[in-house]
């Protein structure tokens, strides 16, 4: 799919394992899952919940194993300063601090005719999840690097963020056969890449409801 080609870096890197998310006790996630997601979670067997959501997540975008879904208990730290950059940007070779690179894709006014599954499950839990989302919220108000262009978003009111970026390089192909409608009118799909020096350590593919971001304290 074109979306996969856009997300995966052009330079081939060693394949990374697909890790199953360990979401823990279902009640632990009940306070942050959207209402529709909670209903879906409750219909799954507890020990299958995380696995099923992660599998659905991969099926939704036909991702290959080059894309790495971050395990919730992985020792990832979010630095106070999040570094944005284009594909040529790296930290100094001797700098081992993680560098976060976000390549966002906005779906504008998603209707029932164009739908994908809600995939908030891969987000980390607890304080780490909160900090990561706060950093993403800050990044949304800045200029993003995307498909060789800088796009500035007027994000003072997230409800009015209307960015459609389905360009020739970022064609969005969605199969409506297997997926339910999104629980929100606007959503964000972002590939978060974690760099240490010149090495891409981890990748996190996030799908976040804008209204959920707004609800964070």
Swiss-Prot record:
InterPro entries: DUF5552
Pfam entry (one): DUF5552
Chain's gene name: C11orf40
Protein name as annotated: Putative uncharacterized protein C11orf40
